[in-house]
From Swiss-Prot:
Gene: Slfnl1
GO MF entries: ATP binding
Stretches of the chain forming a coiled coil according to its record: 373-407
Pro residues compositional bias, start-end: 154-185
Pfam families named among the record's database cross-references: SLFN_AlbA_2
Family: Belongs to the Schlafen family. Subgroup I subfamily.
Domain of life: Eukaryota
Keywords, ordered alphabetically: ATP-binding, Coiled coil, Nucleotide-binding
Record-given protein name: Schlafen-like protein 1
Gene3D superfamilies: Schlafen, AAA domain
UniProt-annotated binding residues for ATP: G268, V269, E270, D271, S272, G273, L274, V275
UniProt xrefs under InterPro entries: Schlafen, Schlafen_AlbA_2_dom, Schlafen_AlbA_2_dom_sf
Region ranges (Disordered): 141-203
Organism: Rattus norvegicus (Rat)
Length: 414
């Protein structure tokens, strides 16, 4: 009975999804095989993704929520139910069920490297002193568990370590595919391909304000708000987002917007710009307001209430729900010009900056010094321009004064 169960589990990981009552592709006769140009390779199949070296300080729900947000950043959206987080004494990892073509999975390491360089991955997601590990299949889990935590977990669907009685495909998984080297221009071409997946048309934060979305009584589910910009960030939310991952995003994005030109964080909107909404009751609104206020009160220098606005916009949907759908909008107004450059830090002493479509931080001491040097250099250039303008005006006034004095000294004798 154990042998049959293990065989069924093993076949589930290595074969594509098959409807009940229908033969699998391996059982089809050779003459009925699909042609080479039928596009079968492009059809997404179910795979298991291993994500290792997660931060054990977070609970399982928090890690699942943060991991889902990270995979969405890597253009690999998954549902919360498809993420299984396992906490071990020496390694906390997750098993994620994804439906994607092989080419997408093959490019994941390079997408991850690019996202790490652009500060798109939350630093707190990874265990201290380690790097985030992404690999396909359960073989990597088996080897890593032997290296990090001793014997493999009991719930692993892999075969027993004993010798295999034969080359039966029910007990042998195919080896992990070798990841091909990225193309030379993947850095720019990859980002261009990701951006092409979004709807055309970009609207800035000011354009959305001009359309009176702030004063509008409702939004319609499925409406298009444009694409993410330097001062506009979308989050899908949903599930336990408000109670788990939202506070981390408040720290990162509010601090980054304060240190740049302001901006807005919209929760309940997909990365593509389509409105979906999140389930948010009046009690959730009160808790969210208290959470935002408590976090921003710890910022340095102090952030006053008039520096930000928290709005809950109702979402009209065709389906009836017991809890209303809303879009949460946290807007950070453009910081007022100060006599000297100010750099805001969170209640945890971290500093973030807003880049085009990404967040940089937490900044190191050297990066903060470079930021201050650039800000002071920019302020010095502005002051030098003002001095040049005032000097030119002074010379013009002195020239006009000399001309008037020359005219007043001349006299006519009759």
């Amino acid at each position: 009975m154990t042998l049959r169960k293990r065989s069924a589990q093993t076949k589930m990981w290595e074969s594509p999804v098959v409807s009940q009552g229908k033969p699998s592709l391996l059982e089809l006769p050779l003459k009925e095989s699909l042609p080479k140009d039928s596009g079968l390779k492009a059809v997404p199949s179910t795979h298991t993704l291993y994500v290792g070296h997660l931060n054990p300080q977070f609970s399982v729900p928090v890690l699942a929520c943060l991991l889902r947000d990270t995979l969405e950043r890597l253009e690999l959206p998954v549902a919360r139910e498809q993420i299984e987080v396992v906490r071990r004494p020496r390694n906390t990892y997750a098993l994620v069920q994804v439906a994607a073509p092989k080419a997408v999975l093959a490019s994941l390491p390079w997408r991850l490297q690019m996202a790490l360089e652009e500060q798109l991955i939350l630093k707190e997601l990874t265990a201290r002193g380690k790097e985030l590990v992404l690999s396909e299949g359960l073989e990597s889990l088996h080897h890593r568990e032997q290296d990090d935590s001793g014997p493999s977990p009991s719930h692993s669907p892999g075969p027993s370590p004993g010798p295999s009685p034969g080359p039966s495909p029910g007990f042998r998984r195919p080896p992990l595919p070798q990841l091909a080297d990225p193309p030379p221009n993947w850095g720019s071409a990859g980002r261009r391909q990701i951006s092409q997946n979004r709807p055309s048309g970009v609207r800035s934060d000011s354009a959305i304000v001009h359309q009176k979305i702030l004063g509008q009584e409702q939004l319609f589910q499925g409406a298009f708000l444009g694409s993410e910009t330097r001062n506009m960030e979308f989050k899908r939310g949903g599930g336990e987002y408000l109670s788990l991952a939202f506070k981390h995003h408040v720290r990162r994005y509010v601090c980054a917007f304060l240190n740049s030109e302001g901006g807005s964080l919209l929760v309940g909107v997909e990365d593509s710009g389509l409105v979906q909404g999140i389930h948010c009751s009046h009690r959730d609104e009160d808790r969210t307001r208290l959470l935002v206020d408590s976090i921003l009160q710890g910022f340095k220098p102090q952030v006053f209430p008039d520096a930000y606005t928290l709005t809950f916009i109702p979402v009209i949907s065709t389906t009836m729900t017991s809890v209303p759908l809303k879009v949460l909008r946290l807007t950070v107004h453009t910081p007022k010009a100060q006599g000297e450059p100010q750099l805001y830090e969170t209640d945890q002493g971290e500093v973030f900056l807003r880049r085009d479509g990404s967040i940089q931080g937490p900044l190191s001491v050297g990066a903060i010094q470079d930021w201050c040097r650039q800000k002071w250099t920019a302020e010095l250039s502005k002051l030098e321009e003002k001095v040049d303008v005032l000097t030119l005006e002074k010379e013009q006034l002195q020239e006009q004064l000399r001309q008037r004095q020359t005219l007043s000294c001349s006299c006519c004798v009759l």
